[in-house]
Structure formats: structure tokens, C-alpha cells
Amino acid sequence: MELALVATVLSLLIGIPLGVITAIHRGRWYSEGLQFVSIIGVSLPSFVVGILLILVFAVTLGLVPAFGRGDVVQLGWWSTGLLTASGRASLLLPSLALALYQITLVMRLVRAEMMEVLRSDFVKFARARGVPRWRIYFRHALRNCLMPVVTMTAMNFGSLIAFALITETVFQWPGMGMLFIQAVTFLDMPVMAGYLCIVSFIFVTLNTLVDIAYAVIDPRLRDATR
């Protein structure tokens, strides 16, 4: 859960600004370069990205641990490594390996939606009125691009939790995926059934949260329910 959460946050914090930049400055060399890098990011599987990250940042540079979770802090039923330095360092590489694919998807989706919104009449009217460009891009245009991003992020978050098996195996991360692999190895049926129930509950909860987020982002949906 912790690994998927950090990967999702990274994908949004990096992917959305990159999508806006490539849409605003389309045709520029750096925009085309980001587009090319995004194709590579979509093409590479997560375990290859993980191995490359380990080789560069853990083995060659020695900046972060190559595997494990580091020190954790127990908060009731939840143990987290976000509150310790070694836990955050151990979280960096696997979360980046998971987030790279999501970053490219978010960037390309925001770029496509942003380019369509920038051709809208309300954007032209805002420019004619002299509204600052940053306000047009990040307050008005970007808000109209977030609906598909919310949907994709929620579905990918559930997929990260359910299918991050290979990444957890590469980094020896003691997560739900590793637990499921061990349960399959030893034919532990109660654990497998519990894992599937938890994943199903997560997907149902995410769908509900997406519907709520739609009403928050788009005021027209709130008005339609009145």
C-alpha cells in the first residue's frame, strides 16, 4: 500500500506539470524530447526499470539501498518507513520504478487533454480579456483536464497494489505482492482468498472515491444533482 501510494503521488507531481509544459510548448525541442522519453517509459517493463535503477543508484553510485524496506515505525496496525531516513531511502527506488510508467501515462493524457482545452472558446476569451497566462493554464485549462486523469489514477492505483508483484520481488520489498507470491508457493488458501478480497474492496472503494472527486472537480455535476 505504501509503495503504491508513493508511486501514485510521484506520478501526479511529475506527470501533470510535464503534460502542461509539453502542451503549452508543443513543437519545441524539449517538448519533443519529453515525448520521446515518454515512449521509452511506456515501453520498458517495471522490472527492467528497477534493475537499471539498482545498477545506477545503488551499485554504481551507492546513494540508496538496493533492496529491503529499511527501519519502520509501528503506528497501531500500520507500519511505515516514511518516518525514518532509511525507510525513505529504501522507498525511493521501488517507487520510482513503479511510477515511471504512470508518469508517462499521466503526462501524455494531460498533454492531449490540455491541447484540446486550449482550443476552446473560453480560453480564447480569457486571453482576449488579458488574464495572465499562468492563470489560464493552471487554474482554468488544467481543471478541465483532470477528469480523465482522476479516473486513470484511481484505476492504476488499484492495479499497482494488485500487480506490483515483480517490482516487490526485484527490490525484496515485503508488501502485499510478496505475501501473495509466498502464499501461492506454499498453497496458503486463506491468505490468497484474503488478498483477493482486499484487492476487490480497494477497487470498489476507488470507484466510489472517483465519483465523489468528479463532483468536486466539475461544478456542473453538483448542480445536476440538485
Residue ranges of each PLM-predicted region?
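Alpha-helical transmembrane segments of integral membrane proteins
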Residues: 1-30, 46, 59, 75-226
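Membrane-water interface segments at the C-terminal ends of transmembrane alpha-helices
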Residues: 36-68, 90, 97-103
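Membrane-interface interhelical connector segments
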Residues: 68-75
